Design a protein with these regions (language model features):
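Gly/charged, well-structured mid-domain segments that form the phosphate/adenylate-handling core
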Residues: 140-143
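Carbohydrate-associated surface elements
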Residues: 25
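Conserved hydrophobic "DFG−1" position in protein kinase catalytic cores
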Residues: 8-9, 193
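Active-site core segments that coordinate phosphate-bearing ligands/cofactors
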Residues: 29, 35-99, 110-121, 125-128, ...
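N-terminal cofactor/phosphate-binding cores enriched in small/glycine residues
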Residues: 1-8
Length: 411
């Protein structure tokens, strides 16, 4: 499921009180800015592993409580449920019998204590929330409840595999050991590394979350998130009308020798990791009289790779060398993007042969709950031929330096 997206509903009826506030929404920017002091930011990171940001669910919950009549009224009556999408689905699927979430989703709310794996009273107080508003935190392959899909199934089936989409993709890629890394290219991008059973010390713009807790065994992850990947290509198609089909971007970009000095910084809702600047907005820089549609398209493709390189640099600084990254998501089929990303990172990218890695990961969690014991089989994933770095180091440095100058212009 989507992780940071915030949902609110009445406990008594199960009816939603407001539209879901998606993970991309920055409406709580002013709220987090008001909370931001060096001391507060340090405490938030120490407790939750996350940067104080409207990206995470806590600020969205607080915004809903302060600005929407429905949630405020339900809270006054003790009838308010806040949750991420998994908690909402579990509640609905079980007919209101289970108000639960798993540790991977809970760790992305900015309310979970990463050491105790329970809701933090300190963070609840910071955001003006109450524990009773939040679901019970469970292991990722707990028995969350049963559902017959309102009679569509002949009998109730157990719900016993729940994971945030990015963590599920890490599991689906078979990254069970410390240092295993994956790159999920969807609406946005997640670059994630298995950090092992001990909470890692991460620095810079990287955050720490819970990967999963399966059969009592805990996995932490280090991660960097990029806001616009597939969404950037959709913008080229639907808003600028530079392409008719999203699949066209790779061949068009590959048809140029280079970007012609054009850089696109897709900060439509701010810059995510490693910058965490919600106040920055998008820009296209370096346009000249010879710049055309193709240069903007290539600049968009390259921007995805440059942002991944930004995150990769921070991850290797915190977690050590990462010689291989598994890639999943729709953009894994874009050969230009895969090769250019491998060139910028200086490491091999191996696209997954499976299309829906997040679903596979959640399914694996459920299988472990139901008694499957072939854990080595989880790591035996099939991947397509990899993309290895092929660009000359001097050219790579020139390209990446141009990107860093473009970003610096906006900061």
């Amino acid at each position: 499921n989507q992780r940071e997206t915030a949902v609110c509903w009445r406990r008594s009826t199960g009816l939603p009180l407001y539209n879901a506030v998606t993970w991309q929404c920055a409406r709580a920017e002013e709220l987090t800015r008001a909370l931001s002091t060096p001391e507060t930011e340090e405490r938030v990171r120490a407790v939750t592993g996350l940067r104080l940001s409207p990206y995470f669910s806590a600020a969205k919950f607080a915004w809903l409580l302060k600005n929407a009549d429905g949630p405020a009224g339900a809270a006054a009556e003790g009838d308010l449920c806040f949750g991420t999408v998994d908690a909402w689905l579990i509640y609905r699927l079980t007919g209101g019998a289970a108000f639960k979430t798993d540790v991977s989703n809970a760790s992305r709310t900015q309310l979970l204590d990463l050491d105790s794996l329970d809701w933090s009273p300190e963070m609840l107080g910071l955001f003006g929330l109450e524990r009773r508003m939040l679901p019970e935190v469970c292991e990722s392959n707990s028995l969350f409840g049963y559902s017959d899909l309102d009679g569509l199934l002949p009998g109730p089936v157990p719900i016993c595999g729940v994971l945030g989409d990015s963590q599920a993709a890490l599991l689906g890629n078979g990254c069970l050991s410390r240092g295993g890394a994956k790159l999920t290219l969807g609406t946005g991008t997640s670059v994630m590394v298995n950090a092992g059973p001990a909470r890692p010390g991460v620095s810079g713009g990287i955050v720490c979350s819970v990967g999963w807790k399966l059969n009592g065994r805990l996995c932490y992850v280090a991660e960097g998130n990029i806001n616009h990947t597939g969404a950037l290509i959709v913008w080229l198609r639907d808003k600028l009308r530079l392409i008719e089909n999203s699949r066209d971007v790779g061949p068009i970009a590959a048809g140029l020798e280079d970007n012609g000095g054009v850089y696109l910084v897709p900060a439509f809702t701010g810059l995510g990791a490693p910058y965490w600047r919600g106040d920055v907005r998008a820009a296209i820089l370096g346009l000249g009289i010879g710049s055309g549609r193709e240069h903007v398209i290539r600049a968009a493709e390259e921007a995805v790779a440059y942002q991944i390189a930004d995150v990769y640099g921070e991850l290797t600084a915190s977690c050590g060398p990462i010689p291989l990254i598994y890639a999943d998501g729709g953009a894994k089929h874009d050969s230009f993007l895969m090769q250019f990303t491998a060139d910028m990172l200086g490491c091999e990218l191996a696209p997954s042969e499976v299309e829906e890695l997040s679903a596979l990961g959640a399914g694996c969690a459920a299988m472990l709950a139901l008694g499957w014991t072939d854990e080595p089989g989880l790591a035996a994933r099939r991947h397509l031929p990899g993309f290895r770095p092929a660009m000359e180091p001097a050219r790579r440095e020139r390209c990446y330096e141009g990107w860093k100058r473009a970003v610096k212009t906006l900061l």
